[in-house]
Amino acid sequence: MAGKKNVLSSLAIYAEYSDPESDGETGVDAVGGATEEKGGLVSDAYGEDDFSRPGGDEDGYEEEEDENSKQSEDDDSETEKPEADDPKDNTEAEKRDPQELVASFSERVRNMSPDEIKIPPEPPGRCSNHLQDKIQKLYERKIKEGMDMNYIIQRKKEFRNPSIYEKLIQFCAIDELGTNYPKDMFDPHGWSEDSYYEALAKAQKIEMDKLEKAKKERTKIEFVTGTKKGTTTNATATSTSTASTAVADAQKRKSKWDSAIPVTTIAQPTILTTTATLPAVVTVTTSASGSKTTVISAVGTIVKKAKQ
């Protein structure tokens, strides 16, 4: 009962700040002023020129978004004031793990039939006319002028940092391998370290080294051929018969090329040695009168080659 009272009270407070559907333009203006005084959902500072500023003027848009988010948080804090809540329910909800809540919800949905699963109803009340006009103008600018919000965000200086992806993951504490499915359906962190490619590469390298070593050992083995016992005599007889037939066939198949090449012998020159005994004294006349003589002693052998 306490939970139902809280929901009804929050809806009643939200209805007070929202515009009634039956009000006209005057009623809308009055309610808009009331929401501005009381800190409504959307402030008038959320103006038309948020995206008309060139270059890096989108920072003002971020500041206005922060102000609007703060105001919405204030409204939520006002609507969430409990009247007389049961402290046991709050403590139990705080103690439970969010993953357990998701798992329990998924189990309930999986056990339901397709007819029982329905889309939740739209929230009661009406959105502020100022916010509707704002969205309508932005949509018209997108259709007519081709304004792209993603391009405006990407053009900012803060998003030109090459390491912005890692910084955002660290700042927002995002789990890249995480999932919204419960663990009983899919658990991305349930794999062991051996399942990742680094450990698989190491194991593969070890197995390849073992195979290479085995191949090297196989090449070192010496194979010895053997013959059966009792077949030695037959083997020798057959070998001699085959050898004799091979010799006979070779003799029958002689051709002109099998004849021996005649070898021509070149006669070596004969050396004749003649021994000549020359006189011991040779007289040489130096003048016509022959009065003076000189003596030359000559003793030896003269070698003479025979003419061919």
Swiss-Prot record:
Keyword annotations: Isopeptide bond, Nucleus, Phosphoprotein, Repressor, Transcription, Transcription regulation, Ubl conjugation
Compositionally biased residues, Acidic residues: 57-78
A single GO cellular-component term on record: intermediate filament cytoskeleton
Domain of life: Eukaryota
Localization, UniProt: Nucleus
Region spans: Disordered: 15-101
Record bears the keyword Nucleus: yes
Function text: Plays a role in transcriptional repression by promoting histone deacetylase activity, leading to deacetylation of histone H3. May be involved in the regulation of beta-2-microglobulin genes.
UniProt name for this protein: SAP30-binding protein
Species whose genome carries this gene: Mus musculus
Gene: Sap30bp
